UniProtKB/Swiss-Prot annotation:
It holds the Pfam family SPOUT_MTase. GO terms for molecular function: rRNA (pseudouridine-N3-)-methyltransferase activity. It comes from Colwellia psychrerythraea (strain 34H / ATCC BAA-681) (Vibrio psychroerythus). Homodimer. The gene is rlmH. Keywords: Cytoplasm, Methyltransferase, rRNA processing, S-adenosyl-L-methionine, Transferase. This is Ribosomal RNA large subunit methyltransferase H. S-adenosyl-L-methionine binds at L73, G104, L123, S124, A125, L126, T127, L128. It is found in: Cytoplasm. Specifically methylates the pseudouridine at position 1915 (m3Psi1915) in 23S rRNA. InterPro entries: Alpha/beta_knot_MTases (IPR029028), RlmH-like (IPR003742), tRNA_m1G_MTases_N (IPR029026). It is an enzyme of class 2 (transferase). It comes from the Bacteria. The keyword S-adenosyl-L-methionine applies.
C-alpha cells in the first residue's frame, strides 16, 4: 500500500523537506509514504479566493490515481489518538487501496476535495502552519506504523 500526502504549496523551507524526508524514509517498502506538491494559486490583494481554491482543488484531485481512498485533513475532521490512528492505518492496509491524504492551502481545501473525501482527519483544533502539518502527518503515521509492528519507536 502507498500513502501519499498531496499538499498545496511548493516553496517550503529546507527544514520542512528534511523533516518530511526523515520520516518518509523510515517506512518499510510495503508501506511507502510520499509527497506530491501542488502549486499554490497566486494570491494578491484583489485575488478571487474562491476561484483559486477551486483551481487548487482541481489540481489536487487530478493528481490522485483512480481508486485511491481520499482522506482530507480538516479542523472539523475526526481527532485520533495514536492507538486509534494505528487501528485506522491497519484498516487502510487491510482495505488494500492506496491512501491519498489532502492538505489544502491557506484557505483550506476546495469544496470538491471535501466532497470527494471518504474520511476527514483533524490533527488538532488549533490552526497549524502548513509546513509543520507535513511533518506532523509523517511522524504520526510513522508512529502508528511502529505501534502496529511493535517497533520500539513508540512507547506508552
Amino acid at each position: 500500500m502507498k500513502l501519499t500526502l498531496y499538499a498545496v504549496g511548493s516553496k517550503m523551507p529546507a527544514w520542512v523537506s528534511q523533516g518530511f524526508a526523515e520520516y518518509s524514509r523510515r517506512f518499510p517498502r510495503d508501506l511507502s509514504f510520499n509527497l506530491v506538491e501542488i502549486p499554490a494559486g497566486k494570491r494578491g490583494k484583489n485575488a478571487d479566493i474562491s476561484r483559486i481554491l477551486a483551481k487548487e482543488g482541481e489540481l489536487l484531485l487530478a493528481a490522485i490515481p483512480k481508486g485511491n481512498r481520499i482522506v482530507t485533513l480538516e479542523v472539523e475532521g475526526q481527532s485520533w489518538t495514536t492507538p486509534k490512528l494505528a487501528k485506522q492505518l491497519e484498516q487502510w492496509q487491510l482495505d488494500g487501496r492506496d491512501v491519498a491524504l489532502l492538505v489544502g492551502g491557506p484557505e483550506g481545501l476546495a469544496p470538491a476535495c471535501i466532497k470527494a473525501s471518504e474520511q476527514k482527519w483533524s490533527l488538532s483544533a488549533l490552526t497549524l502552519p502548513h509546513p509543520m502539518v507535513r511533518i506532523l502527518i509523517a511522524e504520526s503515521l510513522y508512529r502508528a506504523w511502529s505501534v502496529n509492528t511493535n517497533h520500539p519507536y513508540h512507547r506508552e
